[in-house]
Curated annotation (Swiss-Prot):
This is Inosine-5'-monophosphate dehydrogenase. Gene3D superfamilies: Aldolase class I (3.20.20.70). Residues 98-155, 159-216 form the CBS domain. Pathway: Purine metabolism; XMP biosynthesis via de novo pathway; XMP from IMP: step 1/1. K(+) binds at residues 305, 307, 310, 475-477.
């Protein structure tokens, strides 16, 4: 017979709306706080936010914007393995400290072969000329091929080989920038100590990195990217392709992470690579968290049914209110220092602050990011307002497209026989994702200022919750007033001082 058990928040399992953070003595201003976090062994983010692996939230465009802002995007798996791997490649090559493994050509190749790399002589840009031993012998530029007419002419007869501007592998960005400026070129060739070609440093990538100083990047200066996989052979094969594409974090993404199939998948995928980290979920209990950690997970994703478009708790009657789930997972993971990711239920920046205060290293967010410019889908008008589509991965539409195995219904071929655990809907259009992330991060920093935490660890140690009533929740929101929109205006410094 079922029994009522006690959770980390007592007999009453609590969620974000049940509590508030208590203010305390503070010597910290919000602008002085540090919200950097670690979401896996060697993956740090400057903003503790990941975008959800949902087909109306995260593809390469949003993942790029997330990484540039200091967060991370998890590319959904309602794509073929080839398509998903290509989405990861788009992120990894968008902003590189160094372009690794660029297209090269051998000195014995022909002009025709070189032009086939691009769209003919008018569009040909440049290609390093590299021997089979990887030794750099020249560069073939647009000037070299512009007036060449013999398609069988060898590259070594056309290429530029004198006065090549090269830099050593590991060169500092400021030194590379100085060389590019001195020689008035847009690409510098990177070689190792034995003059073997390693990669390219470009002006565009240097400019991008200066525009986004807090971007999440790997050791090679490329934007960070994560991708979701399933369990079984499909998940394993997908993981192999994603690793080849350069993914930083694989997310074993299921509705019930405390399942033997998921535990086996984590253990199996973990053996594929020593450099790629594994996040697994979703769970909502102490035991579920421990099981995933024992299976080899580098981070654990927490949340059964808290999302705005998730109906698992209604359809199956299963779940744990999110705050209690986070605290239970943190308790299970703290002795091994495994990060906990709070997935779902974030409606306001204050909810993000509460999730972090409860011990989460970061939060995964879907609905707040779904209506942005960078999310998949088109903006449409409804009753005079702009919206974008948003649906749960447990909705009929998403399950029919490929996510049925997330809910262990992969064998169901007739969509009428699917048992959905999510809905399809729309969210208001929000503009660029950078604005949404700014508000979320700003709310978190404000909470840290109220509590007195200079960084996330300090914030978590100082934070205390107070339970509130329904009346307290109503009092917390704007009330007894009609909210009117007003355009922002800049207040002169003298007026602000008064």
């Amino acid at each position: 017979m079922a029994r009522i058990i006690e959770t980390s928040t007592g007999l009453d399992a609590l969620t974000f709306d049940d509590v508030l953070l208590q203010p305390g003595h503070s010597e910290v201003m919000p602008g002085q706080t540090n919200i950097a976090t670690r979401i896996a062994q060697d993956i740090e983010l400057n903003v503790p936010i990941l975008s959800a692996a949902m087909d109306t939230v995260t593809e390469s465009r949003l993942a790029i914007a997330m990484a540039q802002a200091g967060g991370m995007g998890v590319i959904h798996r309602n794509l073929t393995p080839v398509q998903q791997a290509e989405e990861v490649r788009q992120v990894k090559k968008f902003e590189s400290g160094m372009v690794v493994n660029p297209v090269t050509i051998g000195p014995d190749a022909t002009l025709a072969e070189a032009l086939s790399l691009d769209e003919g002589p008018r569009h040909f840009r440049a290609s390093p000329v590299v021997e089979k031993s990887h030794r750099l012998v020249g560069i073939l530029t647009n000037r070299d091929v512009r007036f060449a007419s013999d398609p069988e002419q060898k590259i070594y007869e056309l290429m530029t080989r004198e006065n090549l501007v090269t830099v050593k592998d590991g060169v500092q960005q400021h030194e590379a920038k100085r060389l590019l400026h001195t020689h008035r070129i847009e690409k510098x060739l990177v070689v190792d100590a034995d003059s073997r070609f390693v990669g390219l440093i470009t002006v565009k990538d240097i400019e991008k990195s200066q525009l986004n100083p807090h971007a999440s990047k790997d050791a090679q200066g490329r934007l960070r990217a994560a991708a979701a996989i399933s369990v079984g052979d499909d998940g394993y094969e997908r993981a192999e392709r994603l690793i080849d594409a350069g993914v930083d974090l694989l997310v074993v993404d299921t509705a019930h992470g405390h399942s033997q199939r998921v535990l086996d998948a984590v253990t199996r995928v973990k053996k594929l690579s020593n450099s790629v980290r594994i996040m697994a979920g979703n769970v909502a209990t102490y035991d579920g968290t421990r099981a995933l950690i024992d299976a080899g997970a580098d981070a654990v994703k927490v949340g059964i049914g808290p999302g705005s478009i998730c109906t698992t708790r209604i359809v199956a009657g299963v779940g744990v209110p999110q705050l209690a789930a986070i605290m239970s997972a943190v308790q299970a993971a703290q002795d091994q220092n495994i990060p906990i990711i709070a997935d779902g239920g974030i409606k306001f920046s204050g909810d993000l602050a509460k999730a972090i205060a409860a011990g989460a290293s970061a939060a995964m967010i879907g609905s707040l990011l779904a209506g942005t410019d960078e999310s998949p889908g088109e903006v449409y008008l409804y009753q005079g307002r702009s919206f974008k589509a948003y649906r749960g991965m447990g909705s009929v539409g998403a399950m029919a497209r490929g996510s049925a195995d997330r809910y262990f219904q992969a064998e169901v071929r007739d969509t009428l026989k699917l048992v959905p655990e999510g809905i399809e809907g729309x969210v208001p259009y929000k503009g660029p994702v950078s604005g949404v992330l700014h508000q979320l991060a700003g709310g978190l920093k404000a909470a840290m200022g109220y509590v007195g935490g200079a960084d996330l660890k300090d914030f978590q140690e100082r934070a205390t919750f107070v339970r509130i009533s329904g009346a307290g929740l109503r009092e917390s929101h704007a009330h007894d007033v009609t909210i009117t929109p007003r355009k922002a205006r800049i207040i002169p410094a003298q007026a602000a001082d008064r």
